[in-house]
Amino acid sequence: MATVIRLTRMGRKKQPFYRIAVTDSRKRRDGGWIELIGHHNPMVAEKTTVVDNERLDYWLSVGAKMSDRVKKITGR
């Protein structure tokens, strides 16, 4: 199973926030996920991002790939 760390969209129309989720790469964007490891809210004045770095490091160590957007948000 190829795992990927990517964003899943939540929120209302024109007011999104995103969960940072570990999921199977074959699932759809908002499909099932294995674990939620954080969230990102781009709609507030100061964009807030919360990530559980311990779990992020774990998933990277077992071979999960990060999407380009998650790399940019987390600064890795």
Curated annotation (Swiss-Prot):
One of its GO terms (biological process) is translation. One of its GO terms (molecular function) is structural constituent of ribosome. Keywords: Ribonucleoprotein, Ribosomal protein. GO terms for cellular component: cytoplasm; small ribosomal subunit. It comes from the Bacteria. PROSITE patterns: RIBOSOMAL_S16. InterPro entries: Ribosomal_bS16, Ribosomal_bS16_CS, Ribosomal_bS16_dom_sf. The keyword Magnesium does not apply. Belongs to the bacterial ribosomal protein bS16 family. This is Small ribosomal subunit protein bS16. The gene is rpsP.
